Every structure is written in C-alpha cells, then in structure tokens.
Regions:
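Beta1/beta-strand and adjacent pyrophosphate-binding region of the FAD-binding site
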Residues: 6-20, 37
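Gly/Ala-rich phosphate-binding loop of Rossmann-like dinucleotide-binding domains
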Residues: 25, 29, 165-167
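Glycine-rich FAD pyrophosphate-binding loop
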Residues: 29-49
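Dinucleotide-binding Rossmann-like beta1-alpha1 core, especially the glycine-rich loop
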Residues: 54-132
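Helical element adjacent to the flavin cofactor pocket in flavoenzyme catalytic cores
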Residues: 145-172
Length: 172
C-alpha cells in the first residue's frame, strides 16, 4: 500500500488490492498482526472491485454467510468514523417479494437465521408492503420479506477506507 520502498520480507503477504484483500489486511492489522504487506499489481480496486454492484444484503440462506454480511454492514457504518474517509454505505433496507407460499416458507427459514445473528427482519403483509414502498403494484404479491438494515456501498470508497484503516493499524 506504500510506493516508498519495496518490502523484502513479511510474515503475511496478501495478494490483491480489491475489497477482499484489503479487508483481510484491515482485519488482521486491527487484530494486532504485524509485518503485513499487501501486494497489488496495479492500483487498489483496479480488478473486479471497481465495477462491483456494492449490494449489502443480509438475507442469505446460510448462517455463516449471513453473519459475514451482517458484520460487513456494521463495519461500513463504523469505518467512516474510524478513518474519516467515506465508504459510500447507504442503509436503505430491502424487500423481497413473495408470489407463492414457497417464497413465504423460504422467508421463514431465513428469518430464523437472521433472528439468530441479531439482524432485524420481518415477513410483512401486502398492506405493510405499501407502508414501506407506497408505489409498488401488488398484483400477484402475497407478502414480502423486509430487511431494514440492508443497503449498498461504493466498493471503491469502502476499499480505500479499509486501506486507510489498515495503514492506521500499521499495515504496509
């Protein structure tokens, strides 16, 4: 992350300056790991991160991935204060629409996972959908799954904020 000199030795070398590599660097540095270096052939986010959608959902079908998403959304909110650099995170919530009973069954399964990790969510009726999204056309809709903490971020800004945080913790 520094062009001042080429590092000849490191205990941990992370290859790739996208959001995944920089996130790993940030988290290791924050946990107190020393002698870390990030290796990137171009600029940070010059690979696939720069054109990623930046969606931050928490509705995942598995416990571990849902927990990672929850922690990520919480991090993006804190990271701006920690680094004084914008992440571009916007917590706007989301609705997943149910057109059949099987959709509602899936929502119940996912709600159990989200309840377990402390992520707010609710299965809502068509009347409640209108309160969240007053302009939606309800034809064929039987319910929805509302996750108010979902959002989206600017992947490049988020990566750069994590890079700054990693440097603040001593990473190179």
């Amino acid at each position: 992350m520094s062009e001042d000199k080429i590092v000849s030795h490191a205990k941990v070398g992370i290859i790739g300056g996208g959001i995944m590599g920089v996130s790993l660097l940030y988290h290791l540095a924050k946990e107190g790991w020393k002698d870390l270096v990030l290796i990137e052939k171009g600029e940070l986010t010059s690979g696939s991160t720069w054109h990623a959608a930046g969606q931050c959902p928490q509705m995942m079908g598995g416990y571990n991935l849902a927990k990672i998403h929850r922690e990520s959304n919480n991090l993006y909110k804190k990271l701006e204060k920690e680094t004084e650099q914008p992440t571009g995170f916007h917590e706007c919530g989301s609705l997943r629409i149910a057109y059949k009973k099987e959709d509602l069954d899936w929502f119940k399964y996912v709600k159990g996972i989200l309840d377990n990790i402390g992520a707010p969510s609710e299965i809502i009726s068509t009347n409640e959908i209108k309160k969240v999204h007053p302009f939606i056309k309800l034809d064929g809709i039987i319910g929805a799954f509302h996750t108010p903490d979902d959002g989206h971020t600017d992947p490049t800004s988020t990566t750069n904020a994590m890079a700054k945080g990693a440097r603040n913790y001593g990473a190179k």
